[in-house]
C-alpha cells in the first residue's frame, strides 16, 4: 500500500503524521495549523476552526505575531488532536469499514480517510516504506533561444526559414540569440508544506514549475544552476523517479470517449504499489479511483464520457477536476500545479487547495501551485509564497510574512484587496500603490525589486535554510531511503532503476484494456472499418467473379491476387491518423511515469489484432471463394495466413513512419511514397523481367513483393490451365494440326492445348515454387524488424518541441513590432521612473471610470431592449433516461445591468447560456419562453447578441487584428462603412489593451498567444460585432490573473454604463469582483434556481436573503460567493441544511420575480417592433460579400500553413518523379503499353493521401465555424463551403502542372504523338486531364467529409470510393467481363472517362513492336510460308510476322497498332475531348454534392415545434 492515497494530490508518505520536519525553522503551531485547520468537511467545528484560523491570520497580518509563541495556537493544536480516533485499517472492503472510509457512501470523509492511511502506513513502516521528497535550488536560471528573430513562415518564405533554422541548429548556441525566461533565483521546499507561486501571465510561473518537474524540453537551464532533490540531481529524477515529480499543465488532455471512471481507474492501476497489503490490484485501483472521485465531487460522473471542446461529455469544471484527480492518482511527492483552479468555482478551488494541504500535512507531500486568482481563504492555507516579476524572483518565504515585507518596502495594500492580489499587483506599475513619502524610495523595475529582495534579511534566512538543507542531504542517506521506498512499490519484473511502478507487461495489459474501452466508447470507426472491408470484399470479388481455370483468366487471376495483397497490405494506412490523436495523452502519461510509450505501442498493436482479424475475415473469405481461387483447404489457409502477415507487416511499417514524424502531414507524405514504391514493385504492375536495373533493388526490400510471389505460386504452381485462345484460330485454322498453332499465353508450348501454371509464372514473373515457404520467413522477419523499429521510435522519439507561449509575427511586420516594443519599453520605464503621488486602487477605480468621459466611449453601442425568459426547462436523453439539465429557470437581463450567473461545476450554467442564445444542438427544451421586449425571438436574434465562449476558439493563422476585422466586417450592419469598422476595431484593440500583440498570430493552445491574450481576443471578437441586444460571457475571467479579471470586469461595467445588457457566468469571483455585478442568478445541481435578485451594496441583498432563510451568518471578511456555495451545499464535502430550490420557489422574492416577468410580457409586448428590414436579416452582410471575405481568410490560412502546402508538393513531386522514372520510356511493346497504362493507374495513387492531408484542416475550420461562427450568424454555411472549394482550386491546378511535367515526359508518352505530329495538342490535353484530376481529388474529399463527423471515417469512405472507381473503370476488367449488375458502376464512374481520355491521348496512333518474350513461335504447315499461312488470320485479328517468308518457324506478334490495344479497353481517340468534358461534369457534381450533403447533414433545420 505504498501508493499515496489520493484525495487530492499524490501525497508523499513519510514517517509520522504530525512530526515537524527536522530542518523546519519555525513553528510547531504552523505545522499544527497545517494538520488541523482543515480536518473534516462540513462538521460543526469547521466554522469555529475557520474563525480561529482567520483570527490568527489577521493577528499575523496586522502585527506580525509569531503564532508559535501564542497559547491560543497551542490550544488549537490540543483541541484538534482530541478529534475522533482514526482506526488505521485497510479501507478496501466496504463491508468491514466505517462509512467515513467508504468512498461510495454519502458519509465519506476524505480527510478522515487520509489520516487513516497515514496511520496504516505508520503501523508498519518497514513494509509500507512511506516516502517524502524535498527540493532546493540555487542560482537557478532558465533561458530560451532566438525568439525575437522567429516569425511565422508562409509558403513564400518557409523554405528559407527552414534552412536558416537548420543552420542555427547545427551551430553552437550563440549567446546573443539567448534570452532569459527565469533570472537567477534560489529556493527550497520542505515536505509537508504547500507553496503558492504568484505572478502575472508571462512572469515565468509555468517555466519555474516545469523546471522543478524536470520538464524542460523546449528551453534550457543555465550551467550554473544547482538543483537538489534530497541529494538527487534532475537527471536522476528524470531517469529513475519521473513519476514522483510531476507537472500538471493548465490544459486538459484526455481521451474524450473514455468515461471518467475508466480514465481514473486506468491511472490508479498503473500506480498501484506492490506493498499494498492483502488487497488485489484491481480492488486497490477501483478503491483509489473512487476515493479521488468522491474527494473531487466526480462520483456522479463515473460513467459519463470525459469529452472535450467538440465531443460532449462532462462540464469544463468537471474536466479540470478529472485532470486533478489523475495527477493525484499518479502518487507524486512533488506536484507542480499550473493554474489548476482554472474553470473551477470558488468553493471547489478552495476545497482543492484544502486537499493539497491535507496531503502535505498528513502525508508529507510537497505541492507547488501557480494560481492567477486566489481568494484570501485559499491564500491562508499556503505555507510559502514565491512572487515572480518578469522572470525575477522578488520574494520567497512564509506566506504570512510576504505582505508585511512589501508593506515595509513602502507599498500600500488597498482595502478589501486579498493578499494574493496585492502581491501580484506589485508587478504591475499601473496597479501598485505607494505609501505617501516613499515615492522615491521604493523599487520600480523588476530588477530593482529583485535587488531589494536579495539584500533583505528574508533572503539571508532563505540562503541559510538552503545551506542547511544541502548539508543534511549531503550524506546520501535520504536518497537511499527514498530509493528503497521506490523499489518497495514496484511490481515484480520491474527494474529498480525504472521510474515506473508496474512492469512492462502489466502496463501493456492495462493499456490493452483501456483501448478496448475506447473502442466501446466510440465504436463507429471499428464498425465502419470492418463493414467497409466486408463490402469491398464482395464488390472486388464480384468484378473477378468465378474465374474459370483457363488461360483467359491468367491476367484477371493476377490482377485479383494483386488487389487482394494490396487491400490487405494497406488496410492499416489510416492507423497513422489515430496515432497522432493519442500522442499528446501518451506523452502526458509518460511524464507521469504511468507507462512507457513503447508499452502503449505494443498494446495498440495487440488490441487492434481482433479488429484486423475481423477485417481480414470479412474481406478474404468472400474474396477468395467468389473469385474462384484454388478450392483446397491448405491453399486457402496459406492464402489467409500470408494476407494476415502482410497486414501486420505493413501496419508496423506505417506506424514506424508515424512514430518518427512530428505531424500527420509529415507522416502521410513518406507513407504514400513508400506505398507507391511497394505497389509498383510488387511484381504485377512491372513484372521482374521488365524492371529497370536502377530500381530493381526496391523489389528486394519490398515485403509485399514476397507475399505476392508466394500467393501467385500458391495459386498457379502444379496446375494445368486449358488454353482459351490459340494463334492462329477461327475458321479454317480450327482444323490445323496442333503443331501448327500455339496458345497465345506466356509459357505455352506448340502442340499443347494447355499451359502449365509453373511455366507461366517462370516466363512472365520469374517466380519459382522453392520461394513459397522461404518468403514466409522473410515476411515474419520484416514484421519483427518493423515492430522493433516502431517500439524503439515510440519510446525514444521526443515529439514536436513547443515554442511556448511566445507571440509570433509575420516576417513583414517584424520591424514594426520591434519599433513598437521599443516605444512600449520606453513608456514602461517612464511610468516606473515617474511614479505619481497617487495610484488608482481597486476601491476607487470605478469611481474614476464613472467620472471621466471620453469621446471614444461614444463608439460603444447604446441599447434599450429587455431580454427575459420564464419556466425554461431543458432535458437530454441519456441512455433510457431523460435527465433534466435546466429546471424551470426564470430571469431577465436589462440594459445597463450586469447579471452574474453562478453555480457549482456541472450545475448547467453554460447550458443555460446556450439555451438562451439558441445554441443547443442536442436535447429538448420542453417548457418555457424566451422573449425580447415581450415578443418572440426572430431570425436576427443570434446576430443581435454577442457570445463570449468559455473555450477560446480561433483560427491559428490569423493575427489578432485580422480576427477582429473579420468579425467586424461580417457582423456589423452593411451600411456601416469599412473605415468606420476599421476605426472601431482599433478602438476595441485599445480598449482591451491588445496593441502590443495586435499583429501577432493567434497560434494554437500552448504556442502563440497566452491564455490571457486569447481570452481578451475572444471578448474582442464579440465586441467588434457591436451586439445591439445582449452580451453573453461564459467564464470570461477563467485562467486570468486577478488584475486582468478586474480589467475585464471594468470593461463590462463600461459597456453596461452605455446601455449594454450583460449576462456573465463566473466561477471564482473575489468579494471585490462580485460587487461589480448588479444581479445574481444562482443555480444548483440539476439546473435549479436558488436565487435570482439584486446583489446590493457589498452583496448585502444576497446575504440578507440567505440569512433570512436559515443560513449561518456570513463573516464580515468572508467572500460572499464562497459563503453562498457552502450554504447551498455546492462546495465539495459541504451539505445544505435545507433544499434551497424549494426555499426559493416558496419565497416572496420568487413571487416578485413572477410578477415582474408577467408585467414585462404584458406591457413590453405593447411596444412597437422594429420593422427595419435590415435589422431582421439573418446575416448582417450579403452572401457575395461573405464569400469573398471568408475565401480570403481561408486562402490566407493555407498560405500561412507551409507545412500543409509543402507536404502536398513534396508528395506530388516525389510520386510523379518516381512513377515517371520507374516506367521510364516504357516503349511500345505489349508489356510497354501495359506499363504505360499502369503508370497512369499509379498516377492516381496520391489521391487518398492528398485527401487525408486536407481532412484535418477542413475539419478544424468546420469546427471553428460550427462552434463559434455559425451560432453567432457571422456568415452562412454556403459561404463557408464555397470558400473551402474555391481556395483549394488554385493550389490543385499548380500541383497538377508540376505533376504533369514530372510524370508525362519521363514516361515518354509524348513520343507516341510524334508519328502523327500531334505532340502539342495531345500534351495540352494531357495537362488539362492531369490538373482536372487534382481538382477532382479535393472536390471528392470535400464532398465525403461534408456529411462525416470524424475525419477517419471520411478517409475510410474515400478509400472505398477510390478503390471502386479503379476497379470499375474498364481497365482491370473490361465491360464485357464485368457482371451485368456492375455495368452501371462503369457508366457512372468518373475514372472511366478519365482513364479513357488519358489512354487515348497518351497511346493512340502508333505502332507496337513486340519484345522477344512476347513473340509466339509455331510451325507453318508443310509447303507454306508463314506469310501465306497467317494472311487470313492477320487480316481478321491483326498482328504481324517478323519474317513472312520463313517456312520452318513462324515468329508472330499478336498486335501491330496501339489502337488495337485501346479498342480492347474502349479508349477511343476520337472521344478524348468528350471524355474530358464528362470528367469536368463529375467535378461539378462533387461540388454540388458537397453543398447538398453539408446542408442535409449539418445545417440545423428550423423546427415548427420550437417554443419561444
UniProtKB/Swiss-Prot annotation:
Name the Gene3D superfamilies for this protein.
P-loop containing nucleotide triphosphate hydrolases
Q: What does the UniProt record say this protein does?
A: Pleiotropic ABC efflux transporter that confers resistance to numerous chemicals including itraconazole, fluconazole, voriconazole and posaconazole.
What's the protein's topology in the membrane? Answer: Multi-pass membrane protein
Q: State the activity regulation.
A: The bis-benzodioxolylindolinone azoffluxin acts as an inhibitor of the transporter activity. Clorgyline analogs M19 and M25 inhibit the transcporter activity by uncoupling CDR1 ATPase activity from the active transport of substrates. Activity is also inhibited by beauvericin and oligomycin.
Provide the residue positions that the database annotates as binding ATP.
Answer: 903-910
Q: What is this protein called?
A: Pleiotropic ABC efflux transporter of multiple drugs CDR1
Q: Which family does it belong to?
A: Belongs to the ABC transporter superfamily.
On whether Membrane is a keyword of this UniProt record, the answer is yes
